[in-house]
Amino acid sequence: MKEKFSNRLEGMMSTYIARNPVTGKTQFMQNWGDYDYNASFGGLPALRKYIADVKAYGMMPTFYVAGYLACATTRAGQKYGLDYGIMPLSTSPSSSVAPKGYLDSYGVFNMCPDNETWSDYIAQTLRRLAADTAIEGVRLDEFGWAKPACFSPRHRHIFAEPGHNENMRAQVNIYRKIREAVDPVDPMFSMAAEHYGYDCMARYMDWALDYDVRNNPDAVRKVPFTLFRFYFPECKTAEYNDGNPMMPEYRLFNAWAVMHPNDPELYHITLLENGDAFDSRDVEPLVRTLRRDVYSHRFSARGKAIYTFFNAAGETVKGGVLPTEPAAGKHWVDLLTGEELKLTSVGKQTAVALAIPDQKAACIARLPELLKVKRIDETLLAEIAAANPDTFLILSDPAGNELFRATAVKGKIEIPLAALKLMKNCPYTVKLLQGKYLRDMTGFEF
């Protein structure tokens, strides 16, 4: 290892060498480029079964593909590496085995995306994977970031003129080709990248990683947020989480997806149950609030409006925060507690009153009044104003755990509290869900 790779790469490459659990032999596990099926693991039939098992579990299986990289040990690397690898203006080889003049991040060929041959190869490879395995999506690693300009004399560039860098434009072209190749196989095939790049690229993607919190220090701003998430909501962003203790609050405030989430289950449930609003195009970042350094976003859908907050004021904020007007048949609810929120006056304005601790997020909603509850001894009587066949009544504890569920019908439903063994003086929530999404919500204390 030390003979072949520099100190910078030695540690990285050593993690790619592992014992094959089937054969017992040590092998290099990161053979980027071919994306064939490992015979020692059972080949394509075993992979198809594994993918089917993942789907049966209720999860969406996707592949990782390093669309920029090709190991010299692979057929792809041997066939395309020298002719279509990136040759930057200057190089600092990271390993003594890298061909002179080639970009060799990760100790392998870094392929130029700005040529027809490699872009066609990636598109047709993904078409094959989708057809062979029934995988439901792919994330192209390293895509969404620009690579150095390529000065190789061994291939013709589609977009770049000599000395120019059209790397991002070339990536867009690859995504277009992938869509054209894969959509006939599976029009619901999910496309993702390591970053969303820019709007022309994101139009072909369903989601992308983001490094906003990880790469941008909090010292330069009160709270992180990404305008891209609001202006192009069809391309979801998944913030890369490296264990930042503030990530749960940032996630709730921005309604982000997060890689390796460390948020409370209640936050996760709140995001899922209001996915219709968070997935909507009717969104507005940084709506006006009545308190300095208290920030808010709006997400609306199906007659409800969700407002998330982040308090960067340096102290707990209490009282009127969000300007509003009374609306017949609507009420304000704290989605984390089920507490009914009151309207108050701030000067000449009507505002929603709530309390938000410093450096914490909050999530409230203006909902249609469809649900009322009343406790009679050991029974909770829920009165439902309207319900469809796919509507459910759910009782949850303060952590969001579901304790009771019943099909909701218009009229009254009795919930036997004694049988649920609820804790005294503890707040609980009752929710009305249509399908997966919240329609109305209220709270009560046992």
Kindly label every feature range from the protein language model.
Residues 1-25, 132-136:
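Catalytic domains of carbohydrate-active enzymes, especially glycoside hydrolases
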Residues 38-39, 46-52, 61-133:
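Active-site-adjacent "subsite" loops/lids of carbohydrate-active enzymes
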Residues 76-108, 112, 168-269, 290:
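Glycan-recognition surfaces
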Residues 246-308, 357-366:
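Aromatic- and carboxylate-lined catalytic core of secreted/periplasmic carbohydrate-active enzymes
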Residues 290-327, 388-392:
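Carbohydrate-binding surface patches
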Residues 344-376, 419-424:
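C-terminal beta-strand-rich structural cap/linker in extracellular carbohydrate-active enzymes
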Residues 362-365, 393, 423-436:
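Short, aromatic- and glycine-rich surface loops/edge beta-strands on solvent-exposed regions
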Residues 367-377, 405, 436-446:
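Edge beta-strands of extracellular beta-sandwich domains
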